[in-house]
Every structure is written in structure tokens, then in C-alpha cells.
Amino acid sequence: EFISYPIYLWTEKTTEKEISDDEDDEPKKDEEGAVEEVDEDKEKEKGKKKKIKEVSHEWQLINKQKPIWLRKPEEITKDEYASFYKSLTNDWEEHLAVKHFSVEGQLEFKAILFVPKRAPFDLFDTRKKMNNIKLYVRRVFIMDNCEELIPEYLGFVKGVVDSDDLPLNISREMLQQNKILKVIRKNLVKKCIEMFNEIAENKEDYNKFYEAFSKNLKLGIHEDSQNRAKLADLLRYHSTKSGDEMTSLKDYVTRMKEGQKDIYYITGESKKAVENSPFLERLKKKGYEVLYMVDAIDEYAVGQLKEYDGKKLVSATKEGLKLDDDSEEEKKKKEEKKKSFENLCKIIKDILGDKVEKVVVSDRIVDSPCCLVTGEYGWTANMERIMKAQALRDSSMSSYMSSKKTMEINPDNGIMEELRKRAEADKNDKSVKDLVLLLFETALLTSGFSLDDPNTFAARIHRMLKLGLSIDEEEEAVEDADMPALEETGEESKMEEVD
């Protein structure tokens, strides 16, 4: 296709030509040698045209598309790049961005890389062979499915690489000396990231790019440890302070409060699901910005991206969230409240048993009565949801990664204060046990977990509704007979305490 000399093909071409009926009849009139008088209608009919097919032969240039990567970038117009991109990829749209460069030194090669405007529908299809980068040696096409040439997460980048230094064996299909390929790969990744940063200079273009290929960038953060920090600069997220716009990690750092050491984030199913999460109550009140990471792949990316610009990334839903900005007086009040709620924490733990690892007084919630947090190194509620959805999941792994939950209670909440009073008055109060179980199940939902037994939860809610509506107790008793057990006996509770 890109041979330097022209290649022509002798082709047959069929064209349609219009001729009038008069032209067709002229020879006949000459032969007859007589002139006839005709009326106007016949004259109009003769004025009509008919089509005939003409066959012609000509030489057609086959290799019209010249190897533009051999020319200087400043000499090539935007239209030439667009034409080359369309011929290379069979795309009907123009490209979003282009990077034309040459590398010189121990290894020399020239390349043109393109970013398309939209992602192909089979971008993450594992059965599809990667054929986005075409490899040429001295302008002779060698292969387009060389997996060593570019990492999988950059599978959407299209382009051409042409090197005079690549040695080939007889079959032309197997490349020798992988060291050369590694050098080319390293340079291609570097230039791709440069190209993405150039796109980021135009907000409108970058929004299109990010919408189409943000998953690829996050996959790169998970897989490419060498370029993780550079790829992190390209990430964009909604946050508690960004409104409808998305913010970069770099901009987040510039807006950090004085004395703030960490970058706070929350993961979840959607922006709507996390923006009113109980985990954000104290952070919002204190004026801290929190990033909303609501893409499933964010869980994997943030698992590898431990820090950015020297700032640790801290999840708002896990243990280890410390906000050391309280005055000495506030700290003293908190300690007093923790002591007064110690007994309630023990009672709740006895009622819930193995469902939670421990019950503590919370520092992170302001309005909600309670929430459930996970271990610092375990799965978040969102990650647990993602792993449950895996068709081929490893159940043995999920048993220890979905670590025991810690229940955090809010001492300033009216429900908790009333519960504390009732529990102190009578530890075995039936209503206390029912309320604790109901609070635990609602905390599961608000914290992003799923219920193991939704029917029991629904039955408990219905029971509360009956009490609120003052429905006949006899009718209620009939309903309760069919309901699953909501509480333990006093003896069972004592046995757990001994254990």
C-alpha cells in the first residue's frame, strides 16, 4: 500500500451517456433523402433523450495514499491527517487527536497515533485480536496484531509504526529481538499520555474523550505501575464541591483545607447513591471535599493508586478515618459521651452477635443514628457488591476479603439516646432488641450493603407500621406467629456473654 513508486491497475469502466432520439434517427433520414413534415407532438417525442452504456478502459492508481509519516508534521494539513486516518481505520468520522513523531538514537522509527472520537462497541471484548497499531518495516506492512507493541489499556489508540531497524525472520510474521519492541512500546505509551494531556487542554474535547475512554485510563492505573502517577493526572471525578463539573486530583489538592493531609473519596453505585451517604456527614460539616468514585473500575484503580502528590487516598467508608481538627473542649465532650454509651455498645454487640465485629461510638456521622464501616484493608460495600456480581467468583476469597463490619453509633442522635435509656432500664426489653435489629438492617442499606434476608426486614417494618397505625393486637399476634424470630431468649444472650 505504501510502496514509494506508483502502482497502476488496468481497469474497465462503464459509464452511462445520454443521447437524444434525433441523433439516433439522423442516419436514417440521410439514407431516405426525403424531408417529412411532422406535427409538434412528434417533434417533442423526438426531443426526448435516452441513456446508453459506454465501456472504457483506463489505468487506475492503486497506492494513492502516500506514507505521510515520512513527511514533516508541519507540512501535513488537517485534511490529510483526516484522510489518512479514515483509510487506516475505515472510520466514517474524523479523529479526535493525532500525534506524529519520530524517535532517533539507538533505535529509529516513525509513528502516527490517532485517538478516535468514540469507543468501539467491542473495546473490551477479550476474544477480539488487537489490530489497532499497524507495523511497517521500510514501508512494507508486516503485522497489525502485535500485542507486545502497545498495552491492552491503550487498545483504542489507532496508528502506524514504521521502523528500518527491525530485523525479521524468513516468515515475516515473527519478530526477533524483543528488546527493540520493548523500546518502541515504552515510547508509544509515553507519546499516548502526552497526546491525552494535549486533549485535556481543550475542556470540550476532553469531556468527549473522558466519557469514551475513562475506563481505559483507570485500567492503566491498575496495570501500569510505571505510568500510574501520569495517568492519575488525567482522572476526573465529581465531588462534594464540584457541582455538575468534574474535578482533577490536581485541582482537588489546590483546594485542600489548611492542615488537611489526606485526599478523601467515597465509592458507590452512582452519584445519587453516595452524595447523601451518612459517611459524608462529618466531612461535609467540617468543609472537607470528598471525591465521588462511582465507576465499578474505580474500586480496582484506587486499590493500586495509594497516594497522589504525596497525599494518601482515604476512603470515607473504611476504618482509619481521622479528623484531628477538634478543640480540646470538643475532644473532652466526645470522651464523656463515649463513656456514657459504652454500655449500649455492649448490649448492641450481644444482640447482633457475629453480624458485626464490634460496636463503637462514631466520629464520622452527624445526623444518621448509625452506619457500618469495613476494615481498612478489606472490601468496601461497593466492592462486595461488584464481587457478588461476578459469574466466576472465588467464594473462598470473598469470605476473608469481605471482613467483619464495625457498627458505629451516633451519640448525638435522638433514637440512640432513647435506646440507651431503655437499655439501661431493662437490658432484655423486647422493643430494644427489635429496634437494634431494625437499625442494623437500615444501616446495611444506607452503608451500601445488601440484605441477606429481605423478607425478615420487610416483616419487621410491617410490624412497626401496625404499631404506628394502632392495629388490633390480636391481629398483630396472628401475623407475628408466622414471622421469623426477631430476638434471642435471655438464656442464649447470657451464654454469648460467657463466650
UniProtKB/Swiss-Prot annotation:
Residues 15-51, 474-499 are annotated as: Disordered. GO terms for cellular component: cytosol; perinuclear region of cytoplasm; plasma membrane; protein-containing complex. The keyword Chaperone applies. A motif (TPR repeat-binding) lies at residues 495-499. GO terms for molecular function: ATP binding; ATP hydrolysis activity; ATP-dependent protein folding chaperone; unfolded protein binding. ATP binds at residue 172. Keywords: ATP-binding, Chaperone, Cytoplasm, Nucleotide-binding, Stress response. It comes from the Eukaryota. It is found in: Cytoplasm. InterPro entries: HSP90_C, Hsp90_fam, Ribosomal_Su5_D2-typ_SF. It holds the Pfam family HSP90. One of its GO terms (biological process) is protein stabilization. Belongs to the heat shock protein 90 family. Homodimer. The TPR repeat-binding motif mediates interaction with TPR repeat-containing proteins. Molecular chaperone that promotes the maturation, structural maintenance and proper regulation of specific target proteins involved for instance in cell cycle control and signal transduction. Undergoes a functional cycle that is linked to its ATPase activity. This cycle probably induces conformational changes in the client proteins, thereby causing their activation. Interacts dynamically with various co-chaperones that modulate its substrate recognition, ATPase cycle and chaperone function. This is Heat shock protein 82. It comes from Nicotiana tabacum (Common tobacco).
